[in-house]
Amino acid sequence: MAPITVSIEVNRSAEEVFAYATDPSRFSEWQKGVVGGHMESRGGTTQVGDRCVSTRHIGFADRPSTSRVTDFDPPHHWSVRGVDGPIRAMVDVTVEERPDSSAHLTIALEFEGHGLGRILVPVLVTREARREMPLNVAALKKRLEGSM
């Protein structure tokens, strides 16, 4: 299945957009359903192999999921791949600096189902993500442009 890809122009520098879009402690500010998140870094600053933990409210419970950072090239590219749970996300964030000092943000998202997730991903999860992703990046844009 093709990734869900959304893009948006943000009137902030690439550095600001990248820092905000890849900080799991800020995900709850712009991603529907996220209630918390943090990085588990080995050396204080993010690097490939570190763990990104985000907690989403699903159904009647808060469920953490862990991803590994697979690419980290600030302020241009960040990728994570889910490593636990029945639904594992693969996320690629790309930020391009524009000549006017704004930034073009692209987020590509794919899911891999394990166990029950094999049924949920094509039936429910992908459809919901296609609906939410444009709203999420619009919220990110509004938050960055309105509060900085």
For each feature predicted by the language model, list its residue ranges.
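Short, surface-exposed coil-to-beta transition loops
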Residues: P3-T5, D62-T66, R88-D92
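A short, compositionally biased micro-patch
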Residues: N11, F72-D73, R98
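Hydrophobic ligand-binding cavity/cleft-lining segments
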Residues: M1-R42
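Beta-strand/loop substructures that line and gate deep hydrophobic ligand-binding cavities in soluble
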Residues: R81-L135
